[in-house]
């Protein structure tokens, strides 16, 4: 066993005790594996990390590119406390002598083009209530489904949310929202990092949105753009649209009690998933009437709004009749330009709803908020 492998193995040795007064005043992160006491989060929103790696020479915590040096005690325990972090979900890694590894005390999440650790910095209970599990309401189910793609000549996987009443109201069919992840993530993102099931359960129970089926599939963009030689922006994730139109939608409508008309079909996505949403829906308006982009990677303004998507925006009256919901949202601290796009669409006579998530960046808290705003708008016709 070489030294690097030995060091990674050492990192896998956890402690479940409390080691310092400052850490004892913090609480265990909700994203930890069962029984693990670290990482912790204190009331100042600082994260506390601790790992046993007695043979390591240098250990850092890497949170979305910001690195914190860890200090070693005499027994080989390394610890670090971060600066206050913004509320919400953060991907992170441990860097042990230059090798980036997942903290074995964290649940694993697919993000940044690989499996990673994650830590949730909580909001206050009232603010976070919309994405928090509520024991006093009915809960839907999330199924893992597999189907075969003739286009890819491979098995694919999707996750499907059904509302709580789906099992008992067997005479009812439901509208369907196809909900896409972003670059470097996969079909697990909305269920795990995005807390979509809690958001849906809470809204349905409160009567804020209609009961619906939600489908989360892999958008063929789970790696970081530029990793494949010669790939252009137009190529990135482009193979997903034909799979969705020709294989995923028929699979869902065959296996679930789904309404099959365009008025009861929606698509939304975050970041590159927003890009895929526009690429899929705006070229297939015979199939979709509700569209949402959450911090969407949208570039069409550069060529003029009248040329975008085969000129779909040139006849505003026709577009407004066909598209019942056209939603754009983003965080106020990011620069993805959804505000400029919304204004350009409005100036062109295109009805749209713009939402600004106050104080958030290109992150899961922005997208949870966007989903929470989008859901009450759809399927209301």
What are these regions (language model features)?
Residues 27, 41-68, 72-381:
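Non-catalytic cap/lid and distal C-terminal segments of serine-dependent acyl enzymes
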Residues 1-9:
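Bacterial N-terminal signal peptides that target proteins for export
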């Amino acid at each position: 066993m070489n030294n690097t492998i030995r060091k990674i193995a050492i990192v896998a040795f956890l402690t479940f005790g409390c080691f310092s007064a400052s850490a004892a005043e913090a609480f265990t992160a909700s994203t930890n594996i069962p029984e693990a006491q670290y990482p912790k989060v204190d009331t100042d929103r600082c994260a506390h990390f601790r790992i046993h790696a007695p043979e390591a020479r240098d250990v850092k915590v890497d949170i979305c590119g910001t690195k914190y040096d860890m200090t070693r005690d005499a027994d080989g325990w390394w610890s670090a406390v971060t600066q206050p972090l913004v509320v919400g979900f953060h991907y992170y890694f441990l860097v042990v002598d230059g090798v980036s590894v997942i903290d074995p005390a964290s649940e694993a999440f697919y993000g940044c083009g690989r499996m990673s650790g994650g830590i949730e910095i909580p909001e206050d209970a009232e603010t976070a209530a919309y994405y928090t599990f509520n024991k006093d309401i009915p809960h839907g189910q999330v199924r893992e489904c597999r189907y075969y793609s003739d286009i890819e000549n491979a098995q694919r996987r999707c996750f499907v949310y059904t509302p709580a009443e789906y099992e008992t109201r067997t005479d009812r069919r439901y509208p369907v929202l196809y909900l896409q992840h972003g670059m470097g993530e996969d079909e697990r993102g909305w269920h795990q990092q995005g807390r979509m099931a809690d958001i849906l359960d809470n809204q349905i129970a409160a009567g804020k949105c209609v009961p619906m089926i939600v489908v989360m599939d892999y958008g063929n963009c789970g790696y970081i753009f530029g990793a494949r030689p010669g790939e252009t922006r137009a190529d990135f994730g482009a193979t997903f649209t034909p799979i969705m139109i020709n294989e995923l939608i028929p699979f869902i409508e065959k296996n679930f009690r789904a309404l099959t008309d365009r008025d009861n079909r929606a698509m939304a996505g975050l970041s590159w998933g927003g890009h895929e949403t526009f690429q899929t829906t705006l070229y297939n308006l015979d199939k979709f009437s509700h569209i949402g982009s959450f911090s969407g990677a949208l570039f069409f303004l550069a060529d003029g709004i009248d040329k975008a998507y085969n000129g779909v925006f040139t006849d505003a009256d026709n577009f407004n009749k066909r598209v019942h919901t056209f939603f754009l949202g983003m965080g106020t601290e990011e620069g993805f330009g959804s505000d400029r796009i919304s204004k350009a669409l409005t100036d062109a006579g295109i009805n749209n709803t713009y939402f600004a998530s106050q104080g958030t960046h290109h992150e899961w808290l922005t997208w949870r908020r966007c989903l929470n705003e989008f859901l009450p708008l759809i399927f209301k016709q």
